[in-house]
Each structure stands twice: as structure tokens, then as C-alpha cells.
């Protein structure tokens, strides 16, 4: 769950909320299940309506519900990050929420917490991102051309074109056809397009594919 743009641009992360809460569906789905509106967490609305933009307010709200993550993998991960990365061993609560935020925010503004420096500091050998079949992988190309020693490779995830109930399925199919220069009006043309894109991903360093199958359908 990393964005290749981070490592291509190598810019400071904006703030704790938009790094650790807003983009993480494991976090906001838990809060949503307990009645927290997604707009209060800064999640964009489909209708373009207003959402919370103050990262401190988002973080404060997160701290009020942090107890929900006790005993979960997400909670264990957060506790580890707070203690080992930012040096805060106490439990996050609404009372110390501001202190947590300030500590993380200050750290994110230092060179040590630039995306590439984090990879180097933790001796991460390889990061594999998850990318749609129609991705141009432009950010991966920037990383490869940058001279940086870190390794960030794509993973081929064709759900957007293989899942016919995906809301953007037809748009994605058209985009796939444009990328390979073929009108995808037959199943064989579709399979050939996937093979072409998979080969492109392999040439960009991909070593795996990722498929989300929500409901397996029997043959009979």
C-alpha cells in the first residue's frame, strides 16, 4: 500500500493524518463501521461535497476511536510505528493526541523522513506497488531513471478490466484498448491485451500479479 509517486518525487509527507489515516482503508473502514462519516476523515465524496480538511481534526477524531484497534493487526502495526519509528511508547488517547500529532509532524519535516531516505534507513530491499493494468507506470520509470539505489517494482492487478461489475469497467476496457492499439470487441482480443500489458509490467520489473476475487462463481 505504497504510492510510487512518493519515491519518484521524494517530497516530504504532508501531515500525519493524510499519511496514516485518510489513505488507509483498513483504518477508515473500521471507523466507518462505528458510525464515523468518511467525510470527517477527509475521504473525498462521490458527489464532490465538502469534507474535513484540517489534519489535526482528523487526527483528533482518530484518537477518540483508537481503542477499537486494540488486539488487531492494524493496532499492532500502529503501536509499533509509534514506538519504534517516532519514539512514543504510550497509548494514543484523545488526551495525548496533540502531542502525538506534533511529534510525528515534526519528524516528517526532516530529511530522515523523506520517502527514499526511509527506505534506505530501514534497509528495505524491495517495495512492490499495486498497479492497474492500464497504469502507464510513469512514476516507476522516473524512479528507475533517477539513479537512486532503492528498488520499487510494480505488481500487475487487472481487476479494473476483469471485474465486469466494476463501476468503471467499460471506461477501463476502452483505456486498455487504447494502450495496446486494439479495439477490444472479442474475448481473444481482451486476453491478448492483458498479455501485452503483463509483458510491459515484466519489463518494468514486475514479478507478481494481484487479483481481488470477491465472489467465486461455480461452473455449473
PLM features: residue spans?
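Metal-cofactor-binding active-site regions of metalloenzymes
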Residues: 2-220
Amino acid at each position: 500500500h505504497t504510492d510510487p509517486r512518493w519515491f519518484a518525487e521524494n517530497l516530504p509527507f504532508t501531515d500525519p493524518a493524510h499519511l496514516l489515516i485518510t489513505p488507509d482503508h483498513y483504518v477508515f473502514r473500521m471507523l466507518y463501521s462505528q458510525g464515523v462519516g468518511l467525510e470527517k476523515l477527509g475521504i473525498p465524496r462521490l458527489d464532490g461535497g465538502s469534507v474535513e480538511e484540517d489534519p489535526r481534526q482528523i487526527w483528533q477524531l482518530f484518537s477518540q476511536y483508537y481503542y477499537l484497534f486494540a488486539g488487531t493487526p492494524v493496532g499492532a502495526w500502529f503501536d509499533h510505528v509509534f514506538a519504534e519509528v517516532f519514539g512514543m511508547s504510550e497509548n494514543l488517547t484523545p488526551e495525548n493526541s496533540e502531542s502525538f500529532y506534533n511529534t510525528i509532524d515534526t519528524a516528517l519535516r526532516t530529511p530522515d523522513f523523506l520517502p527514499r531516505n526511509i527506505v534506505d534507513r530501514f534497509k528495505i530491499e524491495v517495495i512492490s506497488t499495486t498497479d492497474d493494468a492500464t497504469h502507464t507506470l510513469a512514476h516507476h520509470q522516473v524512479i528507475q531513471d533517477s539513479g537512486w539505489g532503492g528498488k520499487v517494482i510494480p505488481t500487475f492487478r487487472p481487476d479494473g478490466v476483469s471485474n465486469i461489475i466494476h463501476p468503471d469497467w467499460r471506461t477501463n476496457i476502452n483505456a486498455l484498448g487504447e494502450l495496446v492499439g486494439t479495439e477490444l470487441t472479442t474475448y481473444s482480443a481482451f486476453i491478448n491485451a492483458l498479455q501485452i500489458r503483463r509483458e510491459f509490467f515484466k519489463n518494468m520489473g514486475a514479478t507478481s500479479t494481484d487479483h481481488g476475487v470477491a465472489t467465486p462463481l461455480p461452473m455449473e
